[in-house]
């Protein structure tokens, strides 16, 4: 739930065509137009409670250029720390990747080797779920709720299922099945999910 706390608020005029904040504010002025969630690493030191006065400190921890199958990539590692009464409660790193927009309509399906899981859960995905998650996390990225934009402007085959929503669902599933609160959570996105 900490992703809903202290989101950056931008005027409409400070948003890009994709409805993300224009680059060059908190995140660096990367020239690649496509922004994607590449994962996160979260340390939970102690719980947040209703009524806590939370201070969030955000910084850019690292920027690196790499070459991938789809071309040049720019990785930005953002660091977020959440404090209550000067005590750190949560420390998190977000990995964000920027790249060119490909007009290739044949997006490669990524098959990962999975072992049999002890616990599984099916969810029904719907654009309303993605819209609601976008709203509660203050994520305006149109690829999650604007089908014409996602398919005609960014050339995805469908709406893109939120990487952070995937992470949220995985974390909840693991906590439900372990019947305890996570102390550390690592999530890596390797391909868009539709």
PLM feature spans:
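Aromatic-acidic/polar surface patches that form glycan- and anion
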Residues: 47-49, 159-163
């Amino acid at each position: 739930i900490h992703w809903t706390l202290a989101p950056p608020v931008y005027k409409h005029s400070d948003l890009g065509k994709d409805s993300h904040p224009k680059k060059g504010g908190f995140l660096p002025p990367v020239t690649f137009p496509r922004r994607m969630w590449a994962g996160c690493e979260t340390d939970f030191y102690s719980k947040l409670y209703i009524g806590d006065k939370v201070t969030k400190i955000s910084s850019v921890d690292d920027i690196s250029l790499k070459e991938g199958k789809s071309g040049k990539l720019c990785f930005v590692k953002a660091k977020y720390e959440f404090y209550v009464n000067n005590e750190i409660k949560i420390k998190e790193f977000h990995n964000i990747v920027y790249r060119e927009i490909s007009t290739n309509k044949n997006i490669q399906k990524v098959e990962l080797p999975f072992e049999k899981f002890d616990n599984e859960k099916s969810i029904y995905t719907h654009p309303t779920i993605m819209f609601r998650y976008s709203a509660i996390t203050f994520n305006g990225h149109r690829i999650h709720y604007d089908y014409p934009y996602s398919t005609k402007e960014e050339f995805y085959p469908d709406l893109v299922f939120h990487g952070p929503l995937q992470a949220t669902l995985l974390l909840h599933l693991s906590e439900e099945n372990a019947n305890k609160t996570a102390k550390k959570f690592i999530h890596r996105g390797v391909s868009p999910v539709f």
